[in-house]
């Protein structure tokens, strides 16, 4: 398993309130339980958000997730940048991903 660098951006669509995070928790077919995110080094927020249908997104880094006690693991998904954020409770995840911003990928349409 490849370790994602701390400086990698982590992007998740939606309001990212604790109740939204709670509803989004699931177990990936690989066995990792957490929430789906887009994550990569060297891509812009807009590039990572391009596969996200929501009008708003939350943004953090892998390093911030790890400082809070969680991790981001590369998992298969709809895009090549899909990953699973795991190891944090919904409140902790929400604090990292709020306030949200407008999805720049949707603004370019």
Where are the predicted features?
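Conserved NAD+-utilizing ADP-ribose enzyme module
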Residues: 1-8, 16-109
């Amino acid at each position: 398993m490849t370790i994602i660098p701390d400086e990698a951006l982590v992007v998740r669509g939606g309001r990212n309130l604790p109740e939204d995070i709670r509803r989004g928790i699931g177990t990936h077919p690989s066995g990792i339980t957490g929430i789906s995110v887009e994550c990569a080094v060297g891509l812009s927020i807009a590039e990572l958000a391009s596969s996200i249908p929501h009008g708003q997104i939350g943004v953090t880094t892998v390093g911030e997730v790890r400082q809070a006690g969680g991790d981001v693991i590369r998992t298969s998904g709809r895009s090549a940048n899909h990953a699973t954020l795991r190891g944090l409770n919904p409140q902790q995840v929400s604090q990292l991903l709020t306030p949200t911003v407008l999805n720049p990928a949707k603004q370019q349409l």
